[in-house]
Amino acid sequence: ALAEAEIEYAEDPCHSIYVKFRVTDDKGLLTPMGADLSKTYFVIWTTTTWTLPANVAICVGPEFEYALVKSGDEYYVMATALTESAMQAAGKTDYEILGTLKGSDLEYMKTAHPFIDRTSLVIVGDHVTLESGTGCVHTAPGHGVEDYDVCHNHYPEIPIVVPVDSHGKMTEEAGQFAGLTTEEANKAIAQHLEDTGALFALQKIIHQYPHCWRCKKPVLFRATEQWFC
């Protein structure tokens, strides 16, 4: 384990991945706009593909505007302000916005995890920004401080899943990816998403990522039980 003061940031190549989570309960708000729920998806964005087995929620900004976007025979939910860049990342030029809703309206909609038999609940959080991605934040409280805080403090019913062990390998909770290192899981998960049609877009980018100040290797964040005396 590392203290916060022992973490430094360095440039790291990674995949910028957009993933489709199919809507299973729209609270009766998307279908009146013309959406076919069997083909309607929240599109999340992440640069840590290996954390997707830990996803239990999708977080949106309560005051942001979100669009229902139609392209071909599919429908996507994403922040209106990021629609153009997200569709461009997917190479989609022919699309239309059917309607908009506030992020707070989306709270408690339900989606299906793309490769694990589990519901990913739509929640709201003030940490969501419109700087990049889709405004629909992949939420894995087992692997992120902000994710943990919003779920632990406001949605205690959401489970905290940590499918990575202390050696940096995926556990049985990661399903078919059990036994892989996180680096191996990045590639395997991206390939599986593409094979199953759940991949919206994939790009290679360079970003700032936390590294250990001693060994200079990327840091993995895990929620673990703690004891204090």
Which role fits each region the language model picked out?
Residues 57, 64-136, 145-149:
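Protease-associated
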